[in-house]
């Protein structure tokens, strides 16, 4: 259950009239079926015993980073089949539990007129606020976004302007190239069952002389509204030449 205060409203009436109606109007129920994100790493005991003292800690830190990256990819673009429904997916039209991509808004410029149309669509859904952000792949940021934001002053200084509509920019490799995901990240609901855990087994692979590390995370995610996020295609935006 999560609240949507921007669409809720209070009800005037006699002092002792039904107050439950007023409270429940601001809540929305979501049926979540948790999925598991998991993986394992087998490491030779000799590497741990003969390697640097920090190696065991590094392995655990690396597993955490891999799991976090996998979760980030699912939050942005998960298809909903035993994983979260990502920001870039429609919330209807699933086939065999796989949700389709949202239609992309094609942009040829990153100017006020182009971006304001998307902000107006968010406002139409009562989801436009000061926390709206633009999520973009780092490659696309440098090639398309940065290249169109930086200007040179008559004095020769370079000034990095904000986007015309003022959004903060979030860099994420989970976002496909030539794509912008626009919305308030807080309008994505991520339900988790406890923290991610990493268990170490020293005898499971005894004959192979290996330690086994197994990582598990239980959770699910979905946008709070079908129009919480809009996806823009910036393939047609002129930008920097990226060397191959």
Residue ranges and their predicted role:
Residues 1-39:
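Assembly/oligomerization interface modules of large self-assembling protein complexes
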Residues 2-5, 44, 137-139, 172, ...:
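Structured loops at beta-to-helix junctions and adjacent beta-edge loops in soluble globular domains
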Residues 9-13, 51-52, 143-146, 222-224:
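Short helix/loop capping segments that flank catalytic or ligand/cofactor-binding pockets
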Residues 31-49, 140:
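Extended, low-charge hydrophobic alpha-helical regions
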Residues 41, 45, 49-105:
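Acidic, glycine-rich loop-and-beta core segments that form the ion-binding/anion-interacting portion
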Residues 81-217, 241-244:
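Extended oligomerization regions of viral-like shell subunits
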Residues 222, 227-244:
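Structural signal for terminal/edge beta-strands and the immediately following C-terminal loop/tail
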